[in-house]
Swiss-Prot record:
Region (G1 motif): 35-48
InterPro entries (UniProt xref): Gprotein_alpha_I, Gprotein_alpha_su, GproteinA_insert, P-loop_NTPase
GO biological process terms held by the UniProt record: adenylate cyclase-modulating G protein-coupled receptor signaling pathway; G protein-coupled dopamine receptor signaling pathway
GO cellular component, one term: cytoplasm
Lipidation positions, renumbered (N-myristoyl glycine): 2
Spans through the membrane: none
Disulfide bonding pattern of the chain: none
Stretch forming the signal peptide: none
Protein name in UniProt: Guanine nucleotide-binding protein G(o) subunit alpha
Organism: Xenopus laevis (African clawed frog)
Length: 354
């Protein structure tokens, strides 16, 4: 008698099984939708990561993209040279050849007329090449931590002949290295390992951060980008604040935020290529006076990594750290593969399916 189910009980059991099945299916669907936030201070490489996703998980840059980035390359190149020229006066550095002053005036005039996005005339290109070869300009470039200069300056200025050619078309690497300040929120969609990613890139400068809060619901994981190179630089928007100190403060507020109690945090210590060169001549103690280790890449990165990871106040939260070079497609492909595996495991655990 106890084993016989009434029609109503059988129907209730069927409904219960169906609900359980639906919940499991919903869990699987939820596990397949991934909302990723790219956060970090200004110029930490967030937008470059977005461009890499386009190369790795979409079809790369279209002919239209290349056309749109061409004036940006022209502008980034001449603006970088103009920034060095302006710093020559500020730092009191003399040109190796006095005749370079006329070339410098030509460059600054083009920038002030807002013609920096135009292809270079043969005269302008020659002036830029002569300037970049000048010993005074090179001395000033080597002191770039004392003023604001794009990371890509050397890359572009070393390629002046190619960029100034009449038939110039930006390469993938040229596009990856372009710098345009992100304003507002940029959303990118792609599919990888059967997951549907929605990646949100939000401007990192102080004025942009108030826009972050709109993105904070239902976040699967945060990728927090840090420019390793910021340890000896000050902010664009506040020249009294060290960039690394600002980034650490920001990481602390994100990592320990109540919104992100159950959110995976992935830390990208970025710009390792530039940092590797910079650390040889600019000591880490500029940012971390307590540091007593050698100014070698491995030890300096390990100390910086510890500074970030020790900000995590939750015993249950793990920080997944990667040392990255956002302009290196192979490196980002490898790292993003590892990041995705973390997300899959984390998601399935959350749904009770792992």
């Amino acid at each position: 008698m106890g084993c016989t189910l009434s029609a109503e009980e059988r129907a209730a059991l069927e409904r219960s099984k169906q609900i359980e099945k639906n919940l499991k299916e919903d869990g699987v669907t939820a596990a397949k939708d991934v909302k990723l936030l790219l956060l970090g201070a200004g110029e930490s490489g967030k937008s470059t990561i977005v461009k890499q996703m386009k190369i790795i998980h979409e079809d790369g840059f279209s002919g239209e993209d290349v056309k749109q980035y061409k004036p940006v390359v022209y502008s980034n190149t001449i603006q970088s040279l103009a920034a060095i020229v302006r710093a020559m006066d500020t730092l009191g550095i003399e040109y190796g050849d006095k005749e370079r002053r006329a070339d410098a005036k030509m460059v600054c005039d083009v920038v002030s007329r807002m013609e920096d996005t135009e292809p270079y005339s043969p005269e302008l290109l020659s002036a830029m090449v002569r300037l970049w070869a000048d010993s005074g300009i090179q001395e000033c470039f080597n002191r770039s931590r004392e003023y604001q200069l794009n990371d890509s300056a050397k890359y572009y200025l070393d390629s002046l002949d190619r960029i100034g050619a009449p038939d110039y078309q930006p390469t993938e690497q040229d596009i990856l290295r372009t710098r345009v300040k992100t304003t507002g929120i940029v959303e990118t969609h792609f599919t990888f390992k059967n997951l549907h990613f929605r990646l949100f890139d939000v401007g990192g400068q102080r004025s942009e951060r108030k826009k972050w809060w709109h993105c904070f619901e239902d976040v699967t994981a945060i990728i927090f980008c840090v420019a390793l190179t910021g340890y000896d630089q000050v902010l664009h928007e506040d020249e009294t604040t060290n960039r690394m100190h600002e980034s650490l403060k920001l990481f602390d507020s994100i990592c320990n935020n109540k919104w992100f109690t159950d959110t995976s945090i992935i830390l990208f210590l970025n710009k390792k290529d530039i940092f590797q060169e910079k650390i040889k001549s600019s000591p880490l103690t500029i940012c971390f006076p307590e540091y007593t280790g050698p100014n070698s890449f491995t030890e300096a990165v390990a100390h910086t990594q510890h500074q970030y990871e020790s900000r995590n106040k939750s015993e249950n939260k793990e920080i997944y750290t990667h040392i990255t070079c956002a302009t290196d497609t192979q490196n980002i492909q490898f790292v993003f593969d590892a990041v995705t595996d973390v997300i899959i495991a984390y998601n399935l655990r959350g749904c009770g399916l792992y």
